[in-house]
């Protein structure tokens, strides 16, 4: 039987299951009936539309006038070459939002994504096929790769570039290949009328599913912040965050609950790290700087923290950092006493 309440229950459980480097299942529960889809559906849309990625936006091929042209010595015509090119998933290596990259191939060979890796860009699907040229061919092309979100049609790209030498391309920036959700019934406090949201996120390798999910959450918070100018909801929520709420998470549990390897645990123990929350409060560089903590141990700790929903250096604690620090200090003082 459901009791009469004056506010909806706030979910406390969150897990991330990394199925592979590009696929993850993200679960949260328990939600009140109807709340699951209310949150899951917009998050799914934001995963597709607001996740930053990279895409080729325009190309100039030496000796080619337009996309319906052909090129001597290349098996593919230009249209098929461009189709193959758009299947390649690029990453810009530096901090730039745009790179103009030149490529040159000569002699008989098959060209794959890995052949386009250089100091400026990386192709994450290295084995993707691009073209075949014979011994008489000389393929030279200049590619514009840009950072963006969502999808931008070639007509708009053409206006932005405004250079007749370049062929504008449809730009598919989103690195999210698939985002789906399931709403499951879950038992909570002997009541079956609660929901569990399970999001499955698949990316193309430009970023991890966890990064894509974090981007979607940030986009949602930013869009909703416009209402805070009137309602001041954020301040109210922040003031309601107490140490009692933190106790419902794993952050105040001992690091022994992480089931770390002996080497990793000993390094943390010698550094004075007692609680899981201390790891969440650290940046990756701070964790890596702990004495005798090797790369293998660093990766193990990062992966485990990510799997429980509190990655090392997480931004999720921005509003509760001081509360968590004070609570951990209080617990340590009690233990020493």
Curated annotation (Swiss-Prot):
Class of the enzyme per the UniProt entry, highest EC level: transferase
Pfam families attached to this UniProt entry: RNA_pol_A_bac, RNA_pol_A_CTD, RNA_pol_L
Record field: catalytic activity: RNA(n) + a ribonucleoside 5'-triphosphate = RNA(n+1) + diphosphate
EC number: 2.7.7.6
Gene Ontology CC terms, in alphabetical order: cytoplasm; DNA-directed RNA polymerase complex
Keywords: DNA-directed RNA polymerase, Nucleotidyltransferase, Transcription, Transferase
Highest taxon above the source species: Bacteria
Entries under SMART domains matching the protein: RPOLD
The keyword rRNA processing belongs to this UniProt entry's keyword annotation: no
Keyword Ubl conjugation on entry: no
GO annotation, biological process: DNA-templated transcription
Molecular-function GO terms, alphabetical: DNA binding; DNA-directed RNA polymerase activity; protein dimerization activity
Record-linked InterPro entries: DNA-dir_RNA_pol_insert (IPR011262), DNA-dir_RNA_pol_RpoA/D/Rpb3 (IPR011263), DNA-dir_RpoA (IPR011773), RBP11-like (IPR036603), RNAP_asu_C (IPR011260), RNApol_insert_sf (IPR036643)
CDD domains named among the record's database cross-references: RNAP_alpha_NTD
Annotated stretches, region: Alpha C-terminal domain (alpha-CTD): 247-337
Region (Alpha N-terminal domain (alpha-NTD)): 1-231
Listed NCBIfam families: PRK05182.2-3, PRK05182.2-5, rpoA
Subunit structure: Homodimer. The RNAP catalytic core consists of 2 alpha, 1 beta, 1 beta' and 1 omega subunit. When a sigma factor is associated with the core the holoenzyme is formed, which can initiate transcription.
Primary role: DNA-dependent RNA polymerase catalyzes the transcription of DNA into RNA using the four ribonucleoside triphosphates as substrates.
Record-stated family: Belongs to the RNA polymerase alpha chain family.
Domain characteristics, as noted in the entry: The N-terminal domain is essential for RNAP assembly and basal transcription, whereas the C-terminal domain is involved in interaction with transcriptional regulators and with upstream promoter elements.
Identification of the protein by name: DNA-directed RNA polymerase subunit alpha
Organism this protein belongs to: Campylobacter jejuni subsp. jejuni serotype O:23/36 (strain 81-176)
Taxonomic path: Bacteria, Pseudomonadati, Campylobacterota, Epsilonproteobacteria, Campylobacterales
């Amino acid at each position: 039987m459901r009791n009469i309440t004056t506010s909806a229950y706030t979910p406390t459980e969150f897990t991330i299951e990394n199925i592979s480097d590009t696929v993850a299942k993200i679960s949260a529960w328990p939600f009140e009936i109807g709340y699951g889809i209310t949150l899951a559906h917009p998050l799914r849309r934001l995963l597709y539309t607001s996740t930053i990625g990279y895409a080729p936006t325009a190309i100039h091929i030496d000796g080619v006038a337009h996309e319906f042209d052909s090129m001597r010595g290349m098996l593919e015509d230009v249209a098929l070459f461009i189709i193959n090119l758009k299947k390649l998933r690029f990453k810009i290596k530096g901090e730039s939002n745009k790179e103009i990259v030149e490529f040159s191939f000569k002699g008989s060979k098959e060209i794959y994504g890995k052949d386009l890796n250089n100091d400026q860009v990386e192709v994450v699907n290295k084995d993707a096929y691009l073209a075949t040229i014979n011994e008489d061919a000389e393929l030279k092309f200049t590619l514009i790769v840009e950072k963006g979100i969502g999808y931008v049609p070639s007509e708009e790209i053409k206006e932005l570039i405004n250079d007749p030498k370049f062929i504008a391309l449809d730009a598919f920036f989103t690195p999210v290949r698939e985002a789906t959700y399931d709403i499951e019934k879950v038992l909570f406090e002997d009541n079956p009328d609660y929901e569990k949201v399970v999001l499955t996120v698949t990316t193309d390798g430009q970023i991890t599913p966890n990064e894509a999910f974090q981007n979607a959450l940030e986009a949602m918070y930013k869009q909703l912040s416009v209402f805070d100018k009137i309602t001041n909801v954020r301040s109210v929520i922040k003031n309601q965050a107490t140490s009692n709420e933190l106790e419902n998470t794993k952050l105040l549990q001992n690091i022994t609950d992480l089931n770390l390897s002996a080497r990793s645990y000993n390094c943390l123990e010698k550094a004075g790290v007692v609680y899981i929350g201390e790891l969440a409060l650290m940046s990756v560089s701070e964790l890596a700087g702990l004495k005798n903590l090797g790369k293998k141990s660093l990766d193990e700790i990062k992966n485990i923290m990510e799997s429980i929903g509190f990655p090392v250096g997480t931004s999720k604690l921005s509003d509760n950092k001081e509360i968590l620090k004070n609570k951990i200090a209080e617990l340590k003082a009690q233990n020493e006493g």
